[in-house]
Amino acid sequence: MIDIAKEHKVNEQIRVRQIRLIGAEGEQIGIIDTRDALAMAREKGLDLVMVSPQAVPPVCRLLDYGRFRYEQQQNEKENRKRARAQEVKAIKFRVKIDDHDFNTKTGHVRRFLEEGHKVKVTIMFRGRERTHPELGERILHRVAETLADIGAPEGMPSMMGMDMNMIMVPKAAPKRDSGRSESAQEAPTARSAEASRPEAPANA
C-alpha cells in the first residue's frame, strides 16, 4: 500500500535510469528503463509514481496520482471523524449539586451522546463526603435515568481516588415504528371487506 503521508517522486522527478514497474492493476511488469515507463504512463493517461525508493532498483507504479491523493485524503478525513466520534468525553459533578447545575451538566452529556461519544461521568468527593459513596451513586443513578432515552451506563460505577466514575454510551438509533405500516395494511383490508359486502335488495 502506498503511504500518502509522505511525498512521492512523480513522473519527471524520477531521475534513476531503471525501475521495477508495477501496472495500474497491481500486475508486475518488471525492470524497465524509466523513460520507457514514462512513455507507458503518458500513453495510458496515468502517472509514474515511485512507491519504494529504497529498493534496488526503485519500485514505481502506474496510477492516477491526483485521484489517488484525493481518495486517500478523503479516507483520512473520514478516519479522523470516526476517531473523534469514539473519543471519550468527561463531565464532572459535585456531590452537593443544585438542580440548575445538574440540568446544565446532563445537557452537556446528552449533547455528547447525540454526537456519538462515550461520556465519563465523574462524581468528585471532598473531605468526609468520601465516607458516603451512596451519595455519588444516587447522582449517577439520576444521570442514567435522565438520559435513559439516549444512553445507558457501561458497567457499574467505580471509585478511583476521590472520584466515582461511570461511563455512559450512546444507544443505537431506534428502528422506525412499524405501527403506521401495519395500520396502512389494515385499511385496504377494511375497504375490501366493505366492497365485498352484498348490497341490500332494492325495495320493490
From Swiss-Prot:
The keyword Iron does not apply. Pfam families: IF3_C, IF3_N. Residues 169-204 are annotated as: Disordered. GO terms for cellular component: cytosol; membrane. GO terms for molecular function: ribosome binding; translation initiation factor activity. One of its GO terms (biological process) is ribosome disassembly. Signal peptide: none annotated. Coiled coil: none annotated. It is found in: Cytoplasm. The keyword Cytoplasm applies. IF-3 binds to the 30S ribosomal subunit and shifts the equilibrium between 70S ribosomes and their 50S and 30S subunits in favor of the free subunits, thus enhancing the availability of 30S subunits on which protein synthesis initiation begins. Monomer. Belongs to the IF-3 family. PANTHER family: TRANSLATION INITIATION FACTOR IF-3, TRANSLATION INITIATION FACTOR IF-3, MITOCHONDRIAL. This is Translation initiation factor IF-3. It comes from Deinococcus geothermalis (strain DSM 11300 / CIP 105573 / AG-3a). The lineage of its organism: Bacteria, Thermotogati, Deinococcota, Deinococci, Deinococcales.
